[in-house]
């Protein structure tokens, strides 16, 4: 079965997309065409959006699923005329909260991601800059300022995990790729030893690692299954020998990996 899903917002669309994606992921037997439509903030844009929704309904033979965080009532009224199954995220959750808290919500456009929260904004920017500056073992002399240091073989998911934790939690995460030289020495590099309490390991299935490396350097020794299998085996042995906690990233999303790491290490998010 195939259905179209729209994530519609008069802001960035982040809230609608994040919640919508999480809900749709529960229906593995259905193939969704997912379309994000941010900044639907005028009557004309709303009318054009209705045309897109109706066209998708006619094409699929089933009405699209609509996740929206539209605040403006006039724009909402126009969207409600579309041939779609509408899920108004704000009204779904805010109305019960208003009753429980005996208070009216501000119901503001872009409130959840407002730059007005200056301290959070600056924490996020600083964390992202830290992740980029300390990517791939680039600046080990700044590890004393890191909240976490991810270690593992090349291309096992360290960089995207560091960037996600920076964006989502304000965590200052560095990453260090373990090389064949590190494996042959059978011990941690000197630059990591004094930061042992910050280390967390990522590993990956060798066949998945081979596929990822082939995209970067096809038909190379670096991407061969034998090399990937060797590196993964040796790095996992190193993790066990040095008593470094680690997880296999193969079957987890970056969101799941990040959450598991923070729980395991007991690191508190900087963004409140």
Curated annotation (Swiss-Prot):
It is an enzyme of class 2 (transferase). Its EC number is 2.7.11.33, 2.7.4.28. It catalyses: [pyruvate, water dikinase] + ADP = [pyruvate, water dikinase]-phosphate + AMP + H(+); [pyruvate, water dikinase]-phosphate + phosphate + H(+) = [pyruvate, water dikinase] + diphosphate. The keyword Magnesium does not apply. ADP binds at residues 152-159. It comes from the Bacteria. Keywords: Kinase, Nucleotide-binding, Serine/threonine-protein kinase, Transferase. GO terms for molecular function: ADP binding; ATP binding; phosphotransferase activity, phosphate group as acceptor; protein serine/threonine kinase activity. Belongs to the pyruvate, phosphate/water dikinase regulatory protein family. PSRP subfamily. Bifunctional serine/threonine kinase and phosphorylase involved in the regulation of the phosphoenolpyruvate synthase (PEPS) by catalyzing its phosphorylation/dephosphorylation. HAMAP family: PSRP. This is Putative phosphoenolpyruvate synthase regulatory protein. The lineage of its organism: Bacteria, Pseudomonadati, Pseudomonadota, Gammaproteobacteria, Pseudomonadales.
